Amino acid sequence: KRQQPGLWGRSADPQQAGLWGKRQQPGLWGRSADPQQAGLWGKRQNPGLWGRSADPQQAGLWGKRQHPGLWGRSADPQQAGLWGRSAGSGKRQERIGIWGRSAEPPQYKELEDLKQKSAIPKAKPQ
């Protein structure tokens, strides 16, 4: 466990000497678990772009601090801004507004339609 602590850290892969250690290049790697994405997975590098992204293909689209209004906590990169915090179609969508925290507000054909849906229902005259 204590062999080459400065070079290896807690690495479990002898093929990636010095690339997995927590104490080597902390600014570049951070806690990366993927040696192919050097410097793209670390928590301390590009916090505004990556945040806590787990998908290297969606650079900067998954971070909690980037585009919070567009992505929210969406788990589906194909539904940008349409999911809010919903991770499954059918749970909370179409109930909070239309999509929750969607970046695109519900579109009404006419202003009167919006007034009718948002107005408090009045008692029918007797």
From Swiss-Prot:
UniProt keyword terms in alphabetical order: Amidation, Cleavage on pair of basic residues, Neuropeptide, Repeat, Secreted
Name of this chain's protein: LWamide neuropeptides
Species in which this protein is naturally found: Anemonia sulcata (Mediterranean snakelocks sea anemone)
Compartments, as annotated in UniProt: Secreted
Gene Ontology terms: biological process: neuropeptide signaling pathway
UniProt main location, coarse: secreted
Tryptophan amide found at: 8, 20, 29, 41, 50, 62, 71, 83, 99
Keyword Repeat appears in the UniProt entry: yes
Pro-piece positions: 1-2, 11-15, 32-36, 53-57, 74-78, 86-93, 102-126
Region forming the signal peptide: none
Coiled-coil ranges per UniProt: none
Compositionally biased spans, kind Basic and acidic residues: 107-116
Described function: Metamorphosin A may be part of an internal signaling system involved in control of metamorphosis.
Any one Gene Ontology cellular component term annotated for this protein: extracellular region
Family: Belongs to the LWamide neuropeptide family.
Disordered: annotated segments: 1-126
